[in-house]
Amino acid sequence: MGKPVVAIVGRPNVGKSTIFNRIAGERISIVEDTPGVTRDRIYSSAEWLNYDFNLIDTGGIDIGDEPFLAQIRQQAEIAMDEADVIIFMVNGREGVTAADEEVAKILYRTKKPVVLAVNKLDNTEMRANIYDFYSLGFGEPYPISGTHGLGLGDLLDAVAEHFKNIPETKYNEEVIQFCLIGRPNVGKSSLVNAMLGEERVIVSNVAGTTRDAVDTSFTYNQQEFVIVDTAGMRKKGKVYETTEKYSVLRALKAIDRSEVVAVVLDGEEGIIEQDKRIAGYAHEAGKAVVIVVNKWDAVDKDESTMKEFEENIRDHFQFLDYAPILFMSALTKKRIHTLMPAIIKASENHSLRVQTNVLNDVIMDAVAMNPTPTHNGSRLKIYYATQVSVKPPSFVVFVNDPELMHFSYERFLENRIRDAFGFEGTPIKIFARARK
């Protein structure tokens, strides 16, 4: 199943971003920045009581020049659409306001669990008026202080209680789950329709749903597939659903539930920052990735156009140097037939295990070719390596001192492993560990 999604909702200036940073900040600070990946602080991974979950700060959703109450309304509705649990945050020093009651009215309509957090209660004396917040109708209010981190444990305990009740859609291990992501109007739905119209594709049914995310199940060459959240690709109409961050949010949920991610670019419009942002999430989540350039039929081209476009992609997506690039047209169906084989290959490589003895031969040959680096008179010594997991393939290299493993040498080892075993379409991870 995908990770549960928790949204923090409330009127401006109640401390949503402070709480977001409190819950997610420690996690964010230990994640190494990936070159070329643009981070968006609206959305972050977090962990509590052995639950991994995704956290949304709806205050980071820019609705534009909408009137004040309309902004609050739209942010709350985004949370109701996308979250599994909602943290409704109010300012304990100001008491219940008309704007709080406005948010409460919107949240009454949701069937999602709502946990009420009363922020800015920095000491015991300030908590005397907490009972006023029962009037909002969401049960026990949890007193917290974002500034000092007080009360967050109790709040997160209450949130985590609801995780066990979240419905999930389970598929067999053999089923390949993938999604098509990209900004609005790049042609994701058209690509799906073109794919499902191929001769060898048998669409069997619409699979079970997780909330409103309808998945499409089909068989291709006797292999079962699920396209995650085909409903999300087609969902249009409301004002906020056309905002960049809403579409990013929807894409992140689909990425989370997929093994392979097809990043769809617009051949006519080229690459924009949002493309990099969404692709960066797929990479950081360790998913297999295929890059699809759609609308290639509409591009004026000569014999060098495709090569130049590919070089431009490699330049913008340096962190996806392992991902194959496919050029196609959903409209004319030209080269549509290349997509499914690329997804299958990426999935196979995402799950690929290599023999330990062969891996160590590759590592030792690499060291012989390019001796290990030294630092302050100490030389890195590599003893042996082993693959510890798949999805994505992950390797531990046992060394004398992990601090001596410079990222450039780690990158060199990754390239040698790729040369030996392929791994096209999937990231691989390498960790240096001290031999005990």
From Swiss-Prot:
Coiled coil spans: none
SUPFAM superfamilies (alphabetical): P-loop containing nucleoside triphosphate hydrolases
Pfam families: KH_dom-like (PF14714), MMR_HSR1 (PF01926)
Phenotype caused by lack of the gene: Essential for growth, it cannot be disrupted. Depletion experiments show that cells become longer and abnormally curved, with nucleoid condensation. Cells have many fewer 70S ribosomes; the large ribosomal subunit is 45S and is missing proteins L16, L27, L36 and interacts with 2 large non-ribosomal proteins.
Cysteines engaged in disulfide bonds, as pairs: none
Binding site for GTP 1: 10-17, 57-61, 119-122
Binding site for GTP 2: 182-189, 229-233, 294-297
The EngA-type G domain, residue ranges: 4-167, 176-351
Domain KH-like: 352-436
Top-rank lineage group of the source organism: Bacteria
A single GO molecular function term of this UniProt record: GTP binding
CDD domains for the chain: EngA1, EngA2
Keywords assigned by UniProt, alphabetized: GTP-binding, Nucleotide-binding, Repeat, Ribosome biogenesis
Miscellaneous field: Estimated to be present at 7000 copies per cell.
Record text on subunit structure and interactions: Cofractionates with the 70S ribosome; association is stabilized by the non-hydrolyzable GTP analog GMPPNP, and inhibited by GTP or GDP.
Similarity comment text for this entry: Belongs to the TRAFAC class TrmE-Era-EngA-EngB-Septin-like GTPase superfamily. EngA (Der) GTPase family.
Official protein name in the record: GTPase Der
Species assigned in the record: Bacillus subtilis (strain 168)
Classification lineage: Bacteria, Bacillati, Bacillota, Bacilli, Bacillales
